[in-house]
């Protein structure tokens, strides 16, 4: 019986098969396709580099050091009260999205969406953040550094009291 999923899988495999993974073959990138568990007709693809192709040819799995692993991306946490239903909630979003993209957060109770930042100019003619919006309304916006545990802010420090990491003793001894 013919199925779209099997045809796509065979098509992906045929396109990915290389006769020789030697140095003569310049493999800039490959796509590895695997079916999505939820829906067999959707395919997820992962890009492989030339070094991955060499590892596949030699049969040795590549082990990356801790330095090569991805570092956690900086995130922001905002706690706000929905103006529609007066529900207080916490939301996380990336620092990159807040400073370069458009961020909307959804109230968990009334499902209303609130604009936090719009640097892509989707909702207005100028780039705005929640700080600008609240300043125009005359409301306050508190910034700081802290810890959020189980949805509650445990420790909050204003920006001028940012805790800096202690200098290591090896850098002090080299002076």
Swiss-Prot record:
<keyword id="KW-0863">Zinc-finger</keyword>
<dbReference type="GO" id="GO:0006457">
    <property type="term" value="P:protein folding"/>
</dbReference>
<dbReference type="GO" id="GO:0005739">
    <property type="term" value="C:mitochondrion"/>
</dbReference>
<dbReference type="GO" id="GO:0051087">
    <property type="term" value="F:protein-folding chaperone binding"/>
</dbReference>
<keyword id="KW-0862">Zinc</keyword>
<dbReference type="Pfam" id="PF05180">
    <property type="entry name" value="zf-DNL"/>
</dbReference>
<keyword id="KW-0479">Metal-binding</keyword>
<protein>
    <recommendedName>
        <fullName>Uncharacterized protein C24H6.02c</fullName>
    </recommendedName>
</protein>
<feature type="binding site">
    <location>
        <position position="107"/>
    </location>
    <ligand>
        <name>Zn(2+)</name>
    </ligand>
</feature>
<dbReference type="GO" id="GO:0030150">
    <property type="term" value="P:protein import into mitochondrial matrix"/>
</dbReference>
<dbReference type="GO" id="GO:0050821">
    <property type="term" value="P:protein stabilization"/>
</dbReference>
<feature type="zinc finger region" description="DNL-type">
    <location>
        <begin position="71"/>
        <end position="166"/>
    </location>
</feature>
<feature type="binding site">
    <location>
        <position position="85"/>
    </location>
    <ligand>
        <name>Zn(2+)</name>
    </ligand>
</feature>
<dbReference type="GO" id="GO:0005759">
    <property type="term" value="C:mitochondrial matrix"/>
</dbReference>
<dbReference type="InterPro" id="IPR007853">
    <property type="entry name" value="Znf_DNL-typ"/>
</dbReference>
<dbReference type="GO" id="GO:0008270">
    <property type="term" value="F:zinc ion binding"/>
</dbReference>
<feature type="binding site">
    <location>
        <position position="82"/>
    </location>
    <ligand>
        <name>Zn(2+)</name>
    </ligand>
</feature>
<dbReference type="InterPro" id="IPR024158">
    <property type="entry name" value="Mt_import_TIM15"/>
</dbReference>
<feature type="binding site">
    <location>
        <position position="110"/>
    </location>
    <ligand>
        <name>Zn(2+)</name>
    </ligand>
</feature>
């Amino acid at each position: 019986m013919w199925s779209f999923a099997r045809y796509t899988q065979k098509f992906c495999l045929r396109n990915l098969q290389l006769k020789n993974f030697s140095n003569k073959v310049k493999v800039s990138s490959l796509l590895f396709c695997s079916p999505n568990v939820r829906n067999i007709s959707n395919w997820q693809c992962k890009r492989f580099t030339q070094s991955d192709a060499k590892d596949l040819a030699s049969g040795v799995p590549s082990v990356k050091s801790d330095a090569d692993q991805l570092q956690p991306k900086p995130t922001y946490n905002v706690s706000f009260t929905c103006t529609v239903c007066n529900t207080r909630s916490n939301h996380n979003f990336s620092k990159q999205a807040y400073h370069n993209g458009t961020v909307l957060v959804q109230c968990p109770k009334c499902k209303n969406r609130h604009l936090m930042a719009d640097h892509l100019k989707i909702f207005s003619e100028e780039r705005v953040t929640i700080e600008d919006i609240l300043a125009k309304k005359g409301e306050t916006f508190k910034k700081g550094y802290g810890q959020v545990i189980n949805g509650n802010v445990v420790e909050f420090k204003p920006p001028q009291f940012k805790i800096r990491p202690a200098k290591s003793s090896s850098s002090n001894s080299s002076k």
